[in-house]
Amino acid sequence: MERYQQLFSQLAARHEGAFVPFVTLGDPNPTLSLRIIDTLIDAGADALELGIPFSDPLADGPTIQNANLRAFSSGVTPAHCFEMLATIRQKYPAIPIGLLMYANLVYNEGIDAFYAHCAEVGIDSVLVADVPLQESLPFRQAALRHNVAPIVICPPNSDDALLREIASHGRGYTYLLARAGVTGSEKRANTPLKHLIDTLKEYHAAPTLQGFGISEPGQVRTALHAGTAGAISGSAIVRIIEKHEDNPAVMLEQLAQFVRELKAATRG
């Protein structure tokens, strides 16, 4: 958890926001997946949000669903993913690493055992996408026991009572949904809801990162001007992987260019 605090402090001192890419571990295969993660970090990613392939990713649109299928077809299992995570952490000791998960993957290992495994390989946060806040207590308790930040989603229609709960229960960062629905850059991010961000700050919530539909530098700037601490981009990145799956050199260069452009937007 402390890696997020250190990151946000360092960025604030430089008057920068965070740019956080999302990819699915093992997409399109384990070897290239690790090269992709190297490329994202080398191009300026401030933190990583990583998915473990899941057969029924309800919160995701077709782009990330296809990433899950590619990873599955290359034989990736949760055990492989944890091996990859240990490799990434050993190579990059300072960068915050978060997992975006579905509850069945946590249940399969056992809630406490899963979070213990996360701590063992150096994971900083876990967002369980299909568990609403009111059902999240066992996950949050296990996360905190193992010093893993439980990430809480803030929907765009949150009322004051929910914002208080989000501020109370979240750690690491707060995942601010730019709009309702599933992931996908084909649906643009709405204008950030500044009153949500201001209220979360008033209630001392973990810093907000805006996600869903972030695909252009202008959207990153808009999110930061509204008061977020940064932005998460997933589908736009995964689409580059999908488009250039058969030409890794082009894929990696396109990914680097995309990350450089969106990271540059965090500098004002």
From Swiss-Prot:
The active site is at 49 (proton acceptor), 60 (proton acceptor). It catalyses: (1S,2R)-1-C-(indol-3-yl)glycerol 3-phosphate + L-serine = D-glyceraldehyde 3-phosphate + L-tryptophan + H2O. Pfam families: Trp_syntA (PF00290). PROSITE patterns: TRP_SYNTHASE_ALPHA. GO terms for cellular component: cytosol. Its EC number is 4.2.1.20. Keywords: Amino-acid biosynthesis, Aromatic amino acid biosynthesis, Lyase, Tryptophan biosynthesis. InterPro entries: Aldolase_TIM, RibuloseP-bd_barrel, Trp_synthase_alpha_AS, Trp_synthase_suA. It comes from the Bacteria. Gene3D superfamilies: Aldolase class I. Pathway: Amino-acid biosynthesis; L-tryptophan biosynthesis; L-tryptophan from chorismate: step 5/5. GO terms for molecular function: tryptophan synthase activity. Belongs to the TrpA family. Tetramer of two alpha and two beta chains. PANTHER family: TRYPTOPHAN SYNTHASE ALPHA CHAIN, CHLOROPLASTIC, TRYPTOPHAN SYNTHASE, ALPHA CHAIN. The alpha subunit is responsible for the aldol cleavage of indoleglycerol phosphate to indole and glyceraldehyde 3-phosphate. This is Tryptophan synthase alpha chain.
